[in-house]
Amino acid sequence: MTVLIHVLGSDIPHHNHTVLRFFNDTLAATSEHAREFMVAGEDNGFTESCPALSLRFYGSKKALAQAVIAKAKANRRQRFFFHGQFNTSLWLALLSGGIKPAQFYWHIWGADLYEVSHGLKFRLFYPLRRIAQGRVGCVFATRGDLSYFARQHPDVRGELLYFPTRMDPSLNAMAKERQRAGKLTILVGNSGDRSNQHIAALRAVYQQFGDTVNVVVPMGYPANNQAYIDEVRQAGLALFSDENLQILSEKMEFDAYLALLRQCDLGYFIFARQQGIGTLCLLIQADIPCVLNRDNPFWQDMAEQHLPVLFTTDDLNEQVVREAQRQLASVDKSGITFFSPNYLQPWHNALRIAAGEAE
């Protein structure tokens, strides 16, 4: 029997760390198909912190892709589980036959499914990637992303799977300890990545609420982002008074980020695709409603779990936000499919499907 190999095809430290830690702590002990990884990027202490895993690191996305393709060609029974993706060479290999459909299992993280970049090289590449994605053996994704994908590729198998957000189920009831009143605090975006469209989001918040709310913008990740942070700060100060705008430019530890989220009353996310599910989960856990773009299909997952959804096109005010908070507080968080530990069983199923041990 050939052991399944997991591939982290792009150097995205935060997401890769979350996946590796999840596999090391939760899956590796019970499945031999949860231990082998090929990772784009440097070790950064992963080998030491994840002793249950066998990790190979590659200095570039291209080097990793070449190694994956070589393994795929050497043994056509070898199967790969691609997490996220973001690696052009791997899509082209699937397109050209270097990797066969029966070898390619893909967990969609959102960004690599959607066609939102306007650069020429992206516009030229998207049609090729779209064809390649139709050759995937099986995709794993959120309900909304599965629906989006199926419209383009109805013949490709799709299975429900959620990114393993780091969550403590014991915190499900903590939100009720806080009395929510007074000036609203609104979280804008889930990171400093430009995909959050921070400036457009700040303008949208201002249009809805004016300079009457506290606005918090976490931008400590990714690194080397100061020019964009300054751009966002300048745009924000043109709308909000200094005491109402908090731009966080330093990377935060998880517990500090969790504490920050729990001081908020509303999350505001205008990106037109599924992303930031970790932040959304932590906000929902704390009874903090989220404003989504109608083109972000994750609203389907929230509606399926009977969670209130606010949209950027809604007329928002404090009364609407407080009512959404009340509705969230009435939801039994222990039953939400995309919360820990409920997302665990689909991961066990996904491993068996990708390894060829389940129909």
Swiss-Prot record:
Pathway(s) annotated for this protein in UniProt: Bacterial outer membrane biogenesis; enterobacterial common antigen biosynthesis
EC number: 2.4.1.325
Alphabetized UniProt keyword annotations: Cell inner membrane, Cell membrane, Glycosyltransferase, Membrane, Transferase
Keyword Cell inner membrane: yes
InterPro entries: WecF
GO CC terms: plasma membrane
Membrane topology: Peripheral membrane protein
One Gene Ontology MF term: fucosyltransferase activity
Pfam name, any one: Glyco_transf_56
GO BP, sorted A to Z: enterobacterial common antigen biosynthetic process; fucosylation
Reaction catalyzed: beta-D-ManNAcA-(1->4)-alpha-D-GlcNAc-di-trans,octa-cis-undecaprenyl diphosphate + dTDP-4-acetamido-4,6-dideoxy-alpha-D-galactose = alpha-D-FucNAc4-(1->4)-beta-D-ManNAcA-(1->4)-D-GlcNAc-undecaprenyl diphosphate + dTDP + H(+)
Membrane as UniProt keyword: yes
Cellular localization per UniProt: Cell inner membrane
EC class: transferase
Protein's job: Catalyzes the synthesis of Und-PP-GlcNAc-ManNAcA-Fuc4NAc (Lipid III), the third lipid-linked intermediate involved in ECA synthesis.
Family: Belongs to the glycosyltransferase 56 family.
NCBIfam families, alphabetized: PRK02797.1-2, PRK02797.1-3
Record's protein name: TDP-N-acetylfucosamine:lipid II N-acetylfucosaminyltransferase
Organism placement in taxonomy: Bacteria, Pseudomonadati, Pseudomonadota, Gammaproteobacteria, Enterobacterales
